Amino acid sequence: LRVYYNDEEILQIESIFGRAGEETPVGEYEIKNKAYKPTWYKKETLDGKTRVRAIPFGHKDHEIGHWWMGMKKLGEPVPGSYGIHGVNVSKINEFFKKNFDWRNGSAGCPNIQDSYLDFLAKMVPRGTRVNIVQKDKWNKKRDFIPPSAA
């Protein structure tokens, strides 16, 4: 994940994106909301039926960390809910060992470590543009939209 300020890259953060079959949708987004110690709404399938379970922050099954930065795809409603988020502190070693081989990945959301996310959530205002591009085709001049264009 690359962070820009005034068209200059100021930070690179190791990130996890969607695994095969649950790819992070490529496109232009904006940060629509931010929540500290968010409730996690997890899709689950039980007996062939899909449901959404609300898991409060602090619960042993909560996996998204201390911050949620919800994203809205520009020009259309978000199909589902994508956001930049962290990982439950008690599961960091397990999660990052499993996912940072780049073969597994997330269920679609960009994931970063909570220490970086804490910084970003405080620094980045709502409405900030987020461009999700294919990592092997990323090109700063073509894909980057500076904050002044937001």
Describe the function of each predicted region.
Residues 47-150:
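Exported/periplasmic cell-wall-interacting domains
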Residues 1-60, 64-78:
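Cell wall/extracellular polymer interaction/catalysis modules
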